[in-house]
Amino acid sequence: MSSNNSNQDNFIRFALEAKVLSFGEFKTKAGRLSPYFFNAGEFNDGAHLSALGRYYSKALQESKLQFDMLYGPAYKGITLAAATAIALVDDGINVPYAYNRKEAKDHGEGGVLVGASVKGRVVIIDDVISAGTSVGESVDLIRKAGAEPAAVLIALDRMERSGNAVDIGDKSAVQAVEQEFGLPVISIANLAGLMSFLTASSDTQLTNYLPAVKAYREKYGI
């Protein structure tokens, strides 16, 4: 489930301007040569983080999902959950958020979870889903706390089948998460939206990458 076309196009434009989204030839962890690269770590100042939170907030509200709080898995998800919580307040929605530590503390407040008490319907927020491992860990922590995962909210759905350059799976990481955990995955943007954006662009530097992106999707996409 992706955001509406207007929000998606604006987000892609924003990611390009911030150099979070770039085109070229990039080797993925799976060993595939991708014509594009998305690095949310480049949203690294106050202005970008504030805008990013608004995109997450809008995608979440457009989904009409019923939720009680936000959860950010360490490490990237921590900042994303906080930024989204702040952005939601601008629309009159004040919800708590929490996150986890990579290692439990045995002093002070102790434990693995930090922030608000984890309860009710919880939205897990991250940048992308690569293998679903982080989602599985988050689901376990949330359920052990007595709460219920409601959805996963990400910035970009690559719409790419799992596996490597040779062995290609039959479904994407997002589809695997939806199937395994029974959770909807909401994305601000996805590969189909990116291709539509490139097709409609008047910038020849961008449209020149469209054939490579199209070929990549035909080979690895869902």
UniProtKB/Swiss-Prot annotation:
InterPro entries in the record? OPRT, Or_phspho_trans_dom, PRibTrfase_dom, PRTase-like
Q: Say if the entry is tagged with keyword Magnesium.
A: yes
Q: Which residues form the signal peptide?
A: none
Query: What UniProt keywords apply to this chain's record, in alphabetical order?
Result: Glycosyltransferase, Magnesium, Pyrimidine biosynthesis, Transferase
The cofactors it requires, by name, are:
Mg(2+)
The terms describing its cellular component in GO are: cytoplasm
Which GO terms fall under biological process for this protein? 'de novo' pyrimidine nucleobase biosynthetic process; 'de novo' UMP biosynthetic process; pyrimidine ribonucleoside biosynthetic process
Residue sites binding orotate per the record: F37, F38, S130, R158
Give the reactions, separated by semicolons, that this protein catalyses: orotidine 5'-phosphate + diphosphate = orotate + 5-phospho-alpha-D-ribose 1-diphosphate
- Write down the EC number: 2.4.2.10
Which GO-annotated molecular functions does the record name?
magnesium ion binding; orotate phosphoribosyltransferase activity
What pathway annotation does it carry?
Pyrimidine metabolism; UMP biosynthesis via de novo pathway; UMP from orotate: step 1/2
* SUBUNIT field: Homodimer.
State the function annotated in the UniProt record. Answer: Catalyzes the transfer of a ribosyl phosphate group from 5-phosphoribose 1-diphosphate to orotate, leading to the formation of orotidine monophosphate (OMP).
Family label: Belongs to the purine/pyrimidine phosphoribosyltransferase family. PyrE subfamily.
Q: What is this protein called?
A: Orotate phosphoribosyltransferase
Native organism: Polynucleobacter necessarius subsp. necessarius (strain STIR1)
